[in-house]
């Protein structure tokens, strides 16, 4: 049995891009493809946008990453802008959608453990056929058998409402 050095997480299509140009991918032979995903999930940025390249270069010249052990004037300023322009009171930066969903799960459970005192409120409702990520909690939050296969036992505490069926969600 041979295994790819790059773990296969999706069935791969035949396109093998080596470069991107705004909303296009360019393969090894120079063929251009319109990229309707323009990245995926948290990276919907397109390809080679000069403004983004400039911002990344500027940041890379000053500071690449700061642990949560330290304060970050730039991070704090961005968090304040987000709080000022949204419903949020606080912000937690993550690097992936799965991490964001994990944080939402933990925040909801922590609220009931620490804030309202009803530690028995641990069940969360998610919708059928939804994708939440590839961590154990986000796989457990999905009702898709293909996501569960090979990862049993799942984490407890999720109920699945039929998508687009508010009455079913209310009944849970």
Residue positions per predicted region:
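PLP-dependent aminotransferase-class I/II
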Residues: 129-172
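Active-site-adjacent loop/helix segments that line or gate small-molecule/cofactor pockets in enzymes
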Residues: 1-24, 69, 162
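Short hydrophobic segments within beta-strands
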Residues: 125-127
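Short, well-ordered beta-strand elements within core beta-sheets of diverse protein domains
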Residues: 24, 43-45, 159-160
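Glycine-rich loop-to-alpha-helix module at the N-terminal edge of alpha/beta enzyme cores
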Residues: 32-119, 123
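Conserved active-site and cofactor/substrate-binding residues in soluble primary-metabolism enzymes
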Residues: 1, 20, 47, 51, ...
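Solvent-exposed alpha-helices and their adjacent loops that cap or buttress functional pockets
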Residues: 16-18, 83-86, 116-118, 150-153, ...
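Short, acidic, Ser/Thr-enriched surface-loop or helix-capping motifs
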Residues: 27-28
């Amino acid at each position: 049995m041979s295994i790819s050095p790059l773990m296969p997480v999706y069935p791969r299509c035949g396109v093998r891009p080596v470069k991107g140009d705004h909303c296009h991918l360019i393969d090894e032979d120079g063929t251009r493809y319109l990229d309707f995903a323009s990245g995926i999930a948290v990276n919907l940025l397109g390809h080679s946008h000069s403004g983004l390249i400039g911002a990344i270069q500027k940041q890379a010249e000053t500071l690449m990453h700061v642990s949560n052990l330290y304060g970050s004037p730039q991070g704090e300023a961005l968090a304040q802008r987000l709080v000022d322009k949204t419903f949020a009171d606080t912000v937690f930066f993550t690097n992936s959608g799965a991490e964001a969903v994990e944080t939402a799960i933990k925040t909801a459970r922590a609220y009931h453990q620490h804030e309202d005192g009803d530690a028995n409120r641990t069940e969360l409702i998610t919708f059928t056929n939804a994708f939440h990520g590839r961590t154990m909690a986000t796989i457990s939050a999905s009702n898709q058998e293909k996501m569960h296969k090979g990862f049993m036992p799942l984490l407890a505490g999720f109920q699945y409402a039929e998508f687009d069926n508010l009455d079913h969600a209310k009944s849970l």
